[in-house]
From Swiss-Prot:
Protein name per Swiss-Prot or TrEMBL: DNA mismatch repair protein msh3
Basic and acidic residues compositional bias, start-end: 35-47
Location relative to the cell: Nucleus
Function as written in the Swiss-Prot or TrEMBL entry: Component of the post-replicative DNA mismatch repair system (MMR). Heterodimerizes with msh2 to form MutS beta, which binds to DNA mismatches thereby initiating DNA repair. Msh3 provides substrate-binding and substrate specificity to the complex. When bound, the MutS beta heterodimer bends the DNA helix and shields approximately 20 base pairs. Acts mainly to repair insertion-deletion loops (IDLs) from 2 to 13 nucleotides in size, but can also repair base-base and single insertion-deletion mismatches that occur during replication.
Biased composition (Polar residues): 21-34
Region Mispair-binding domain, residue ranges: 200-327
Keyword flag Aminoacyl-tRNA synthetase: no
InterPro entries xref list: DNA_mismatch_repair_MutS-lik_N (IPR007695), DNA_mismatch_repair_MutS/MSH (IPR017261), DNA_mismatch_repair_MutS_C (IPR000432), DNA_mismatch_repair_MutS_core (IPR007696), DNA_mismatch_repair_MutS_N (IPR016151), DNA_mismatch_repair_MutS_sf (IPR036187), DNA_mmatch_repair_MutS_con_dom (IPR007860), MutS (IPR045076)
SMART domains, per the entry: MUTSac (SM00534), MUTSd (SM00533)
NCBIfam families in UniProt: PRK05399.1
Family affiliation: Belongs to the DNA mismatch repair MutS family. MSH3 subfamily.
Keyword Chaperone: no
Length: 1117
């Protein structure tokens, strides 16, 4: 049969792709059909099928010919044949006649156009259409064959393409939910729409679970919801996008909005991301660390109880069970293990701080605000409150924020502009002075907030009083009275915090009013925010880590709770001389050789206390403690109490100092209670978190025993049924098997006669080529009963465990006191380790305000430097020399020297030994510093403005018992103004305030002030150095020693040389410096000559002022 030229050529690279038909092909002579009637019938059938398919385009399954034709360019296939014999057509018809009718592929629009244009008759037009349909089918088969070969060569279904297909299949929420929970399957979809409208329409009806998720999300729009679906927790919509970004997991595309917005109408499901159930807390911790609020939505019913209930056809009941933020996350299992935080890391305090303030009064520098704060540490139960007035610099707020270092802030009402900017500055940056990003929430404050807060707090604590035992009536009434006497602003904060913590289920922390502390109690030295940063008390100023800080230097603790207590000691040094002496005497006793055995015993006990007992106790109090964690905590308490079981009174402890005796004597007092709780617990089951066997048999509740008996009864009936099933199958006895977690399966061989005896009522569960596995109706019924008993047993076990936690929580205070005693011992041992270092001495405490130190050293620099630190003496006394004017070359060690003095004073009042040869310290009530140069762009304040504002705050707060450090005051303005301000401030500090003062300056003119203090209240000292060489070879050697007198040069050009400024630039600067020095020297010489002339005159011979000026001018020359 003749073929057209386009078909007769062999396959080549040019015609491997499908080409558009030419006009001549329609006029080529066609072969005559041997059965015209049959052919005509087939044509009619194909036209009918083709028409049907055009109407059902949107119902075509994926990978149809239409989809494949779009990818023709990507698939290499042989050139198609144009005609086939009638025998072949008949054969194809016969092959497909038994199966379902095959839907013909719709012709392309271009083909239909050509047929309409060139066909001479309907009959003639049908035949080319028939060829196109057959050609498409053949091409489809060839493509499928090629695809199978392609997949086979890549490695089968496990290759990359196969994996991707599996993943995309699993991503379907309906399939996933069906696998995890049958009751959460998608609702029955409406019949698919016909015609092209179906392609434009989106997914249509929501599933019951999706409606459930939308309802929950609308109530909790401020949270990222992790929803339990079977064995996974899933995020939906916008939550999925956030979770995918923060957790680096896959987000399956879909709808991101929950308001059914028209822009997402074409999407048929929500975007989703998922995490495994056992990894929940790992991912939750990452989300809250990023600053998010996370809600956990759990299935609160199980499949067995659901199947037995009335809502078996409804989705699982789900409920928001937990809400977490950075401050309220107490379920951190990792934080309970390990002794202390890693070296160099910043120890987060975990405080949640609530702040409110009244409307600002005054304007500008006279602005005043009244502030109230309440800070809660949910992980330990500590509560700090304060009520104070703050000035326009907001230094008081800054001090408290830096001391408490909160991880979360709750702002009640609107803050003033200055306060809000300060809070945002401290909390807003990714890595700030707190070491991490701080979460900030805001809540409204009504005009009647004070009255509402008083009423709310009163009712909250009144309920606690009512529920208290009769024996606790006095304590409860005292508790209520203490709370009602709180200041108004504190009450507002307390009420807001109670409401806020109720959302997280942690409101019970406010029951522990024994641990309420006032921040501003004057029993501690005041270290304000500037001091904490300048002296690097908690963090260094380089990377804000703890390495290189005073806390890092003193921290040798072995436990987490000991580390937290030491942090409080370092930030709040004592003012009580008797308590200080008691603490330092205890350290002296711990480091003595006579007590080595007892010290090793204490260290051994602390070394065994691997868990964070303080956090475990508060988790028990909240009812959040896990079974293995409870066992660990109780066993640790038992070990501690038994270790000192021989101590019946403080005198039996083996030490002489009261603080050690009382701490050790309190440890064995809890032994009886701890043993009573441990005796209820099955050790092996608790360790393996087995809730069903957690309690010893004698301690099990009636409900637990009842359901265990019910399970045993059902299992007995199942064993009895074995013989019945055997009779049905004609066997003597059958054995149950368990496959893939499915119990009580009855196995029957496929090729045996027993298979014919299996009743039709038996349900086939699984099978292989050789075996079939069945459940009979009786087995199914009994298994359902067993599952119901199991679920009820689980609920009974959880209830009994919660009751045990509540019973232990009733003993919270004695247990907490024991842990606090252990933390005190840990801190004292840490400080004794510091005291054992060479060069540390026990300080002597004086009643007057003084600092007398011989050969003192900087505690942190000494540890960080490999070279030996140059020691220096310090002598300051309120009745003698109470101020030092420190001068010296740049980089000569001035700042290190004054910091060293302040740090030794702080260490002494912490109760630690100090790095010196000898030390006599008075009780300082505060340390104030004004160091460094920086502006405050947020407040529109220049460097000099900030400098003077901080100085003004110091002058208002400092007392004769304070230590004040001022570093280069006045450098932010012109020399004349700077000198004038510095001189006035220094004179006021020494003469009027009478504070101990260290004043660093490069203004040599100030050195003459010593002459105005005849009793040597002010003294000049300088950092010594040596000069060698001259000109370009001039070198300065820093000795880092403190000497008497004044350094008349700062040697700034030496620093320029060390900074590698260009040599020509340095030479020009040196020339200009020499010219200026000569000019100033000539002026001073002229002034000196003028003074001499005045003195020589008869009228001024006895003028002492002129003689003093003469001496000063001569010294400056």
């Amino acid at each position: 049969m003749p073929l057209s030229s386009s078909q007769s050529s062999p396959p080549s690279s040019q015609n491997l792709k499908r080409k558009q038909q030419t006009i001549s092909s329609f006029f080529t002579k066609k072969p005559q059909s041997t059965k015209p009637e049959e052919s005509h019938g087939a044509d009619e059938k194909q036209r009918t099928n083709g028409a049907e398919e055009v109407g059902n385009e949107n119902r075509a399954p994926p990978h149809t010919a239409d989809a494949a034709e779009e990818d023709d360019d990507d698939i290499v296939a042989p050139a198609p044949k144009r005609a086939r014999t009638n025998a072949h057509r008949q054969k194809d018809t016969d092959q497909t006649s038994d199966g379902p009718p095959r839907i013909a592929e719709p012709p392309k629009s271009s083909q239909r156009t050509e047929l309409a244009k060139f066909a001479s008759s309907p009959a003639g037009a049908a035949e080319p259409e028939e060829m196109d349909e057959e050609e498409a089918q053949e091409r489809k088969k060839e493509r499928e064959k090629l695809h199978k070969q392609f997949v086979r060569r890549l490695g089968g279904p496990d290759c990359l393409i196969g994996i991707n297909r599996h993943v995309s299949g699993e991503a379907d929420p309906a399939l996933e939910e069906a696998a995890e929970a049958d009751e959460d399957e998608e609702a029955v979809q409406a019949p698919p729409a016909k015609g092209k409208a179906a392609a434009k329409k989106g997914g249509g009806k929501l599933t019951p679970m999706e409606r459930q998720i939308i309802d929950m999300k609308r109530k909790h729009m401020d949270k990222i919801l992790a929803v339990q679906v079977g064995y996974k927790f899933r995020f939906f919509g916008e939550d999925a996008r956030v979770a995918a970004k923060e957790l680096s997991i896959v987000c399956i595309p879909g709808k991101f909005r929950f308001d059914e917005h028209p822009s997402e109408a074409h999407l048929d499901r929500f975007a989703s991301a998922s995490i495994p159930v056992h990894k929940l807390h790992v991912h939750v911790k990452r989300l809250i660390t990023a600053g998010h609020k996370v809600g956990i939505v759990r299935q609160i019913e199980t499949a067995a109880l659901k199947a037995a209930g009335d809502n078996r056809n409804a989705p699982f009941v789900r409920k928001l069970t937990n809400v977490y933020t950075k401050g309220t996350y107490i379920d951190d299992m990792e934080g309970l293990e390990g002794p202390t935080a890693g070296a160099g890391t910043t120890a987060a305090t975990g405080y949640m701080l609530c702040i409110t303030e009244t409307n600002a009064k005054g304007w500008g520098n006279d602005e005043k605000v009244h502030v109230g704060i309440v800070a809660v540490q949910p992980a330990t139960g500590d509560i700090v409150f304060d009520d104070f007035e703050d000035g326009f610099m907001r230094s008081e707020i800054e001090t408290r924020l830096l001391h408490l270092a909160p991880c979360e802030l709750l702002i009640v009402g609107d803050l003033s502009k200055a306060s809000d900017k300060l809070v945002q500055h401290l909390a807003g940056s990714k890595m700030n002075v707190f070491g991490d990003k701080v979460r900030v929430e805001r809540t409204t404050k009504s005009k009647t907030a004070a009255a509402e807060a008083h009423s709310h707090v009163s009712s909250f604590y009144a309920d606690k009083v009512k529920s208290a035992n009769a024996s606790d009536d006095t304590q409860a009434s005292n508790l209520l009275q203490k709370v009602l006497n709180l200041p108004e602003q504190v009450s507002i904060c307390l009420s807001s915090m109670i409401k806020h913590m109720t959302e997280y289920g942690l409101e019970h922390v406010f029951d522990l009013t024994k641990y309420f502390q006032h921040f501003s109690s004057r029993s501690h030295m005041l270290l304000n925010g500037n001091t904490l940063m300048s002296l690097e008390i908690y963090q260094n100023q380089t990377d804000h880590s703890s390495r290189g800080s005073l806390f890092w230097t003193l921290d040798r603790t072995q436990t987490r709770f000991g580390q937290r207590l030491l942090r409080k000691w370092v930030g709040r040094p004592l003012l009580d001389k008797s308590k200080l002496e008691e603490r330092v005497n205890a350290i002296e006793e711990l480091k003595s050789m006579e007590k080595v055995a007892m010290v090793e015993r204490l260290k051994g006990v602390l070394g065994k206390a691997k868990c964070d007992l303080e956090k475990i106790l508060i988790r028990i109090y909240y009812g959040r403690c896990t079974r293995p964690e409870l066992l660990t905590g109780l066993q640790t308490l038992q070990m501690i109490a038994q270790e000192f079981g021989d101590v019946k009174s403080p005198e039996d402890s083996g030490f002489t100092t009261p603080i050690l005796n009382e701490a050790i004597a309190s440890l064995p007092t809890i032994l009886e209670d701890v043993l009573s709780f441990l005796n209820k617990i099955n050790l092996h089951a608790a360790r393996n978190d087995d809730k069903y066997e957690f309690f010893r048999e004698a301690e099990e509740t009636e409900d637990i025993s009842e359901h265990k008996l019910g399970i045993a009864s059902v299992e007995h009936e199942l064993r009895e049924y074995q013989s019945v099933a055997g009779k049905i199958l004609g066997r003597s006895k059958i054995q149950y098997v368990t496959v893939a977690g499915i119990d009580y399966l009855i196995e029957v061989e496929n090729n045996s006669s027993y298979l014919k005896r299996v009743p039709a009522s038996w349900v086939k569960i699984s099978g292989t080529k050789k075996l079939s596995r069945f459940h009979s109706p009786e087995v199914i019924k009994l298994l359902r009963q067993r599952d119901q008993h199991k679920e009820a047993l689980a609920a009974a076990c959880d209830h009994a465990y919660a009751s045990l936690l509540a019973e232990i929580a009733a003993n919270y205070q004695p247990f907490r006191d024991c842990v606090q005693s252990l933390a005190t011992i840990d801190c004292l041992l840490s400080l004794s380790s510091i005291a054992n270092q060479p060069g540390y001495v026990k300080p002597e405490y004086a009643d007057n305000t003084c600092i007398h130190v011989e050969q003192g050293r900087h505690p942190m620099v000494e540890q960080l430097l490999l070279d030996s630190y140059v020691p220096n003496d310090i002598n300051l006394d309120s009745e003698e020399t109470r101020a030092l004017l420190v001068t010296g070359p740049n980089m000569g060690g001035k700042s290190s020297y004054v910091r060293q003095i302040a740090l030794i004073a702080i260490m002494g009042q912490v109760g630690s030994y100090v790095p010196a040869q000898s030390a006599k310290l008075g009780m300082l009530d505060a340390v104030f510093t004004r160091m460094g140069a920086f502006d405050n762009m947020l407040a529109g304040e220049s460097t000099f403005m900030v400098e003077l504002s901080e100085t003004a705050d110091i002058l208002k707060q400092a007392t004769p018992r304070s230590l004040v450090i001022l570093d280069e005051l006045g450098r932010g303005t012109s020399t004349h103004d700077g000198v004038a301000i510095a001189q006035a401030v220094l004179d006021y500090m020494v003469r009027s305030l009478r504070s101990l003062t260290l004043f660093i300056t490069h203004y040599q003119h100030l050195s003459s002030m010593v002459h105005s203090f005849p009793n040597h209240e002010l003294r000049n000292v300088h950092m010594r150095f040596t000069e060698s060489g001259s000109g370009q070879d001039e070198e300065i050697t820093f000795l880092y020693e403190v000497g008497e007198g004044v350094a008349h040069r700062s040697y700034g050009l030496n620093v320029a040389r060390l900074a590698n400024l260009p040599v020509p630039l340095i030479e020009v600067a040196k020339q200009k410096s020499a010219e200026l020095e000569q000019k100033i020297r000539r002026r001073r010489l002229a002034g000196l000559m003028s003074t001499v002339e005045n003195i020589m005159s008869d009228s001024a011979k006895n003028d002492e002022g002129l003689i003093t000026r003469l001496i000063s001018s001569a010294e400056q020359l």
